[in-house]
Design a protein with these regions (language model features):
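Conserved P-loop NTP-binding catalytic core
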Residues: 2, 7-10, 50-121
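N-terminal pre-Walker A segment at the start of P-loop NTPase domains
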Residues: 2-26
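C-terminal lobe/lid and adjacent interdomain/linker elements of RecA-like ASCE P-loop ATPase modules
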Residues: 7-11, 346-439
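Phosphate-binding P-loop
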Residues: 27-33, 323-326
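Phosphate-binding glycine-rich loops of NTP-binding sites
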Residues: 32-75, 126-128, 313-314, 319, ...
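Electropositive, glycine-dotted interaction segments
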Residues: 103-258
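Conserved ABC ATPase signature
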Residues: 248-254, 259-321, 330-343
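C-terminal structural cap/anchor segments
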Residues: 310-312, 316-376
């Protein structure tokens, strides 16, 4: 099975994650469609799922000292009496393409939290397996680690039996970055550079302000850049096709918009305006302003004058297009319905789905109306199996039809019926969901 790094390698297409032992999350398995929705009542744990995914990916990329600090973060350690101090577990199922062959990748690790001053956190287990997609072949083990030993597969024809020395808070996947000769070096590189973006800015106003001061590291077109007009200018200059696509889909949602214009204004930043080298900011020699031309107005207006919903929709569409450019594996959007009229939301979600390439989107909501515009197969419902512990379940295929039928019988929308069940502790979820939540 040759997977030597060659030209034409693609990013990591995340298919599923499993999270356990993070705040109030217990064995949460999320299988990703293009768009995946976490639906639950307020204060249930939807945001914890997003935070746990972010934490899991950041832990892979973190330095050894940073990992030790992360493993001692008391704000994240489970404190529910039913799962106090439970180990953190993070597993991913991924698709990646190498040399025109698609591979299934399974990677996961587990560590022990530092629950008190006397405990030393350590990585309990780690595993990496791969197999060609749709071939029926068995997985090939590349990393096999437990609390006593760490092993890796050195050659394509050998077994996963070569010992490797790692620190208690170091991942084998980190150590193998220096092993350029191993045949799966490209997968190791990709694992260590997976990207996740969290969009939880419910007020987008500040992102439209022209500002010559920018954070170092965000000078170029990045998905998490805070200066949106500058990002749009760079998109127009560096990737005009993507810029045209952004304008096209936005005008689909807002038909009165005729054009989106971005202008650059040069400024003279004098010597006295330069910041010290050790500050995390820099002063550029230009500011950028975004304008929108509306068919009902005599002249273009500053985009900052648009409604809150119009600004947030444009910002999110921009992030998604940038995600495809930058090989971001997953974007999380909290409350995408915020400030968006219900009549617009269905078209908005359809456009988001169509824009996605290898990137996936996960959204959270506690709004009944959003559910009515989502495919039931996209939805993971948050249900308490034990008090205070969050679990999420998908619908059975028969449960999807039953939910729609029962909602119609009660003359309710699917979303209203679903949330009425969530609010009722006596609801019988077993008929609807993939597993028995009361077993």
């Amino acid at each position: 099975m040759s997977i030597v790094k060659k030209e034409g390698c693609f990013g990591m297409k995340i298919q599923a994650v499993l999270i356990d032992g993070f705040k109030n999350l217990s064995n949460v398995k999320i299988s990703f469609a293009n768009i995946t929705a976490l639906v639950a009542l307020n204060n249930f744990g939807k945001s914890n799922v997003l935070a746990a995914i972010d934490f899991g990916l950041e832990f892979i990329k973190g330095a050894i000292d940073d990992k030790a600090e992360m493993m001692a973060n008391s704000n994240l350690i489970p404190i529910n009496s039913c799962m106090f101090g439970r180990n953190y577990k993070f597993e991913m199922e991924i698709l990646t393409e190498i040399n025109n062959i698609e591979y299934q990748v399974f990677y996961g690790y587990e560590f022990s939290w530092k629950c008190n001053e006397n405990m030393k956190p350590y990585i309990v287990s780690e595993c990496l397996r791969i197999r060609p997609e749709n071939t029926g072949q068995k997985y090939t083990q590349l990393i096999n680690r437990d609390s006593r030993k760490a092993l890796y597969k050195r050659s394509e024809t050998g077994r996963c039996s070569s010992k490797i020395n790692v620190e208690p808070t170091e991942l084998v996947a980190n150590k193998l970055r220096a092993y350029d000769e191993i045949f799966y070096a490209d997968i190791i590189r990709k694992l260590n550079s997976m990207k996740f973006y969290m969009e939880n800015n419910l007020d987008a106003k500040s992102f439209y302000q022209p500002d010559p001061i920018i954070r170092k590291g965000l000078e170029n077109m990045t998905i998490d850049a805070e200066n949106l007009p500058r990002v749009i200018y760079q998109l127009r200059e560096n990737n005009p096709q993507k810029f045209d696509l952004l304008k096209e889909v936005y005008k689909e949602l807002f038909p009165d918009v005729e054009d989106i214009i971005v202008k650059q204004y040069m400024i003279n930043a004098g010597v006295n305006d330069k910041l010290p080298l050790d500050v995390p900011f820099m002063i550029t020699n230009a500011i950028h302003v975004l304008f929108v031309k509306d068919k009902n107005l005599k002249h273009p207006i500053n985009f900052a004058m648009m409604s809150d919903g119009a600004k947030r929709v444009f910002m999110i569409l921009t992030r998604i297009i940038l995600a495809n450019v930058a090989n971001v594996s997953l974007i999380a959007i909290e409350e995408p319905e915020n400030s968006v009229h219900p009549s617009l939301f269905q078209a908005y979600i359809q456009i988001v789905s169509q824009l996605l390439d290898d990137c996936k989107v996960i959204i959270t909501s506690h709004s009944p109306y959003i559910v009515s515009y989502l495919e039931p197969s996209w939805i993971h419902v948050g249900v308490n199996e034990q008090p205070g512990i969050a679990k999420f379940f998908t619908f059975k295929k028969s449960g999807q039809r039953l939910l729609q039928q029962d909602a119609a019988d009660f003359k309710m929308s699917t979303g209203d019926y679903l949330f009425s069940m969530l609010a009722d502790e006596e609801s019988n979820w077993g008929e609807y969901l993939e597993c028995d939540v009361y077993e």
